[in-house]
Amino acid sequence: MYYVSKRFEVSGAHYVTTDRRTKCEELHGHNWIVIVHCKSLTLNEDGMVTDFTVIKQNIMSRIDHKNLNEVLPFSPTAENIAKWICDETENCYKVEIWESENNKAVYEI
């Protein structure tokens, strides 16, 4: 089994509506740190599990410097964003996303 990881940063704004009133319901921004983990039993014709550039471009072009509530079809919590990134990335099995130094969400298949 081959394993690779790609780390990148994404800047964006969002708000999250909850049952209780919190500061997260106001539009605010993050500089997310994202690590995408991929695996494969075989390498593609280029000798890779997946192309790191394609991972970054596919995600960043859609959410970097955007209001995530306007561009994503779901509530943009860190957990939902992590799942979406994994679903959108070939051979992905795990995504880690930090909203801040102290807050991290992980989605793993």
Segments predicted by a language model, with ranges:
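Charge-rich, low-complexity N-terminal segments
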Residues: M1-I109
